UniProtKB/Swiss-Prot annotation:
This is Pseudouridine-5'-phosphate glycosidase. Binds 1 Mn(2+) ion per subunit. Pfam families: Indigoidine_A (PF04227). Its EC number is 4.2.1.70. One of its GO terms (molecular function) is hydrolase activity, acting on glycosyl bonds. PANTHER family: CARBOHYDRATE KINASE PFKB DOMAIN-CONTAINING PROTEIN (PTHR42909:SF1), ZGC:136858 (PTHR42909). Keywords: Glycosidase, Hydrolase, Lyase, Manganese, Metal-binding. It catalyses: D-ribose 5-phosphate + uracil = psi-UMP + H2O. InterPro entries: Indigdn_synthA-like (IPR022830), PsuG (IPR007342). The active site is at 22 (proton donor), 156 (nucleophile).
Length: 302
């Protein structure tokens, strides 16, 4: 069941700009209390930018679009919460589970609710050991079939970025750089992977979104927004940490859904919190840019 908060429903119906937010960053992406503070601060960024935030999560089997502060607090602290991807939504509903929604599940809920723009930190993608594990995130399949706009700082740096970009190409997903001509690399802004298309204003992007909708192309538009320059980390240092984290994951036999949370936690601890600080900064930055895009989209409808 999908339940839209009254203030979010009113915003959608009156053509106010709305920005969706995921909740696995709360349940599995950051430690407490950084997860709670970040979730509330990101919502505040969107409000101050003139848009309406709609954090999405699952509580007792109900897909909630527009979590209350009390519900966000619950997801930030509760134990045994599930990481809920698109394929898990029906099970979560049937078994009355609670948990954070991944990019794919949040995209689905956003689209069903009528929200056009979704901001996240980084998407999932092709894992570096995919040749052996076949570990490819459902996020990529969702991007290839759900027509909303996703603002991110690229794919998480722990992934195989060239393979992820190639997979998106295969799925026919338009990747647009926002004030960049390279696919962002999450912790460090420049991956060296050139993008075919880029824009410099929210208005340009809004026009592309409108044309996509007019043509009825049922695929997402992925907006690559680099982390703030002052918060971007040095590539060599990050890559060393990632290699060590991947080795530790193998030693600990970490697999499937547990891989990404394990790696992010390892990086945060072994970078003395630097990766966590960058993660927080880029999520806020993406929320701000998402708000500008949502406002540009709605401006043409009023």
């Amino acid at each position: 069941m999908l339940q839209i908060a009254p203030h979010v429903k009113e915003a959608i119906e009156t053509l106010k700009p709305v920005v969706a937010l995921e909740s696995t960053i709360i349940t599995h992406g950051m430690p407490y209390p950084a997860n709670l503070h970040t979730a509330l601060e990101v919502e505040q960024v969107i409000k101050e930018a003139g848009a309406v935030p709609a954090t999405i999560g699952v509580i007792n089997g109900i897909i909630k679009v527009g979590l209350s502060e009390e519900e966000i607090t619950y997801l930030s602290q509760a134990k045994d919460l599930h990481k809920i991807s698109l394929k898990d939504l029906s099970v979560a509903a049937a078994k009355k589970l609670s948990g954070g929604t991944t990019v794919s599940a949040t995209m689905f809920a956003s689209y069903k609710a009528g929200i056009q723009v979704f901001a996240t930190g980084g998407i999932g993608g092709v894992h570096r050991d995919a040749r052996e594990s076949f570990d490819v995130s459902t996020d990529l399949e969702a991007l290839g079939s759900i027509p909303i706009t996703v603002v991110c700082a690229g794919a998480k740096a722990i992934l195989d970025l060239p393979a992820t970009l190639e997979y998106l190409e295969t799925k026919g997903v338009l990747v647009v750089g926002y004030k960049t001509d390279e696919f962002p690399a999450f912790y460090y802004g420049r991956s060296g992977l050139k993008l075919e298309h880029s824009v410099t204003t929210p208005g340009e992007l809004a026009q592309i979104i409108r044309e996509r909708d007019a043509l009825e192309i049922n695929k997402a538009i992925l907006v690559g927004n680099p982390p703030p320059e002052e918060m971007a980390l040095e590539k060599g240092k990050v890559e060393q940490l990632i290699e060590a984290a991947l080795q530790q994951a193998k030693v600990n036999n970490i697999k499937g859904k547990d891989v990404t949370p394990f790696l992010l936690d390892y990086l945060a601890k072994n970078s003395k919190g630097e990766t966590l600080e960058t993660n927080i900064a880029l999520v806020k930055n993406n929320a701000y840019v998402g708000s500008l895009i949502a406002k540009a989209l709605m401006a043409a409808k009023i």
